[in-house]
Amino acid sequence: MSTKPDMIQKCLWLEILMGIFIAGTLSLDCNLLNVHLRRVTWQNLRHLSSMSNSFPVECLRENIAFELPQEFLQYTQPMKRDIKKAFYEMSLQAFNIFSQHTFKYWKERHLKQIQIGLDQQAEYLNQCLEEDKNENEDMKEMKENEMKPSEARVPQLSSLELRRYFHRIDNFLKEKKYSDCAWEIVRVEIRRCLYYFYKFTALFRRK
């Protein structure tokens, strides 16, 4: 009688391991970074939408504004390294959120895929940021000297503001004692956040 659950569990882990293998293969080449970011972000958006059937009406009264930094909402021409840093910070913070006392009614398959995608993405981005650092260290001073005054004032995507944003989400979950409504609100909010990051991948591709 236990054959069916066992088979389901085996299939689930096989799919998860396949996801790890694919991500690991892509991580060998930072030239494929945009392909990876676009694919994983889109998959996570789909998983977040599939984790719950619909947003409970009774949770509307608990909904709050987490204030995703305006620079992320309005930024249209970020530098590649800014995007990488922002994606790296988002991946770490979102992974930490989804590794806590998650909503018991969420579909485990989707949650596991999100966790794996974010974890592999963070490792991949860290590798590429290190490569950028090594490649550009000698050119940094030259570029700063050649930079025009108007370019020097271009705002950067702030990792600090992004950390504060996720800190507000984390505090909300703690204050609500990780209630079902709190997790549903957070699910929708992080899906919104990922939507803006998905738009960044298009900018990255045009660079």
Curated annotation (Swiss-Prot):
Entry keywords, A to Z: Antiviral defense, Coiled coil, Cytokine, Disulfide bond, Secreted, Signal
Annotated SUPFAM superfamilies: 4-helical cytokines
Coiled coil: 118-148
GO molecular function list: cytokine activity; type I interferon receptor binding
Cross-referenced Pfam families: Interferon
Subcellular location field: Secreted
GO cellular component: extracellular region; extracellular space
Disulfide bond residue pairs: C30-C128, C59-C181
Signal sequence annotation: 1-27
InterPro entries with a match to the protein in the record: 4_helix_cytokine-like_core, Interferon_alpha/beta/delta
Tissue-wise expression: Expressed in keratinocytes, monocytes and in resting dendritic cells.
Induction: By viral infection, upon exposure to double-stranded RNA, or upon treatment with either interferon-gamma or interferon-beta.
Family recorded in the similarity comment: Belongs to the alpha/beta interferon family.
Function: May play a role in the regulation of immune cell function. Cytokine that imparts cellular protection against viral infection in a species-specific manner. Activates the interferon-stimulated response element signaling pathway. It is able to directly modulate cytokine release from monocytes and dendritic cells. Binds heparin.
Protein's name in the database: Interferon kappa
Species per Swiss-Prot/TrEMBL record: Homo sapiens (Human)
Name of the gene: IFNK
